């Protein structure tokens, strides 16, 4: 079902699963809670809502007797799938993460300057319908940090108290990189 009245859709008896994909975190939390209240399962594509309210949403879904999930195919859900696989195989999981091409000067990028870093002109980006705020969030590290928070919420892994540091490391370097491996 598709429609302009989200509340009617959430209440519709033929709807079993709601896919929340507004990209608006505050609205997404409202949509999820309303869906749970009407006995609907939720697949949440709005990862920002999960990063900020994921444990609450999971708890509310469980209380309502429905399922709450991240969207499979998006990076956070794929990371969670790998964590689940490793734990099922009996491996102790001490860290999970994602690759991200990050260079120090990316932290100074803004939506007004982002296209130079992607090798695009503003005209090309506009023609392609590309959102400078979204593309900047991938570049400056804020989107990977939000996605990492969603992974921590879903897996029970913790995040460092001093934040995500994005240490430069190859796959072979990971076990010997102090900011990646657990502190003892």
What are the residue ranges of the model-derived segments?
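Short glycine/serine/threonine/alanine-rich loop segments
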Residues: 40, 65-67, 91, 157
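Glycine-rich, aromatic-lined ligand/substrate-binding cores of catalytic
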Residues: 144-184
């Amino acid at each position: 079902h598709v429609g302009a009245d989200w509340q009617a859709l959430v209440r519709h008896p033929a709807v079993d699963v709601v896919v929340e994909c507004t990209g608006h975190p505050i609205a997404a939390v409202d949509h999820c809670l309303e869906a749970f209240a009407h006995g609907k399962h939720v697949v949440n594509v709005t990862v920002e809502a999960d990063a900020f309210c994921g444990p609450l949403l999971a708890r509310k879904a469980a209380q309502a007797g429905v399922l709450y999930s991240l969207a499979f195919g998006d990076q956070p859900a794929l990371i969670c799938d790998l964590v689940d696989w490793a734990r099922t195989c009996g491996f102790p999981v001490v860290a999970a993460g994602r690759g991200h091409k990050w260079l120090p000067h990316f932290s100074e990028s803004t939506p007004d300057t982002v296209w130079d870093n992607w090798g695009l002109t503003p005209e090309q980006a506009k023609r392609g319908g590309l959102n400078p705020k979204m593309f900047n969030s991938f570049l400056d590290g804020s989107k990977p940090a939000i996605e990492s928070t969603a992974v921590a919420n879903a897996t029970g892994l913790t995040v460092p108290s001093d934040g995500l540091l994005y240490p430069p490391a190859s796959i072979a370097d990971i076990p010997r990189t102090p900011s990646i491996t657990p502190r003892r």
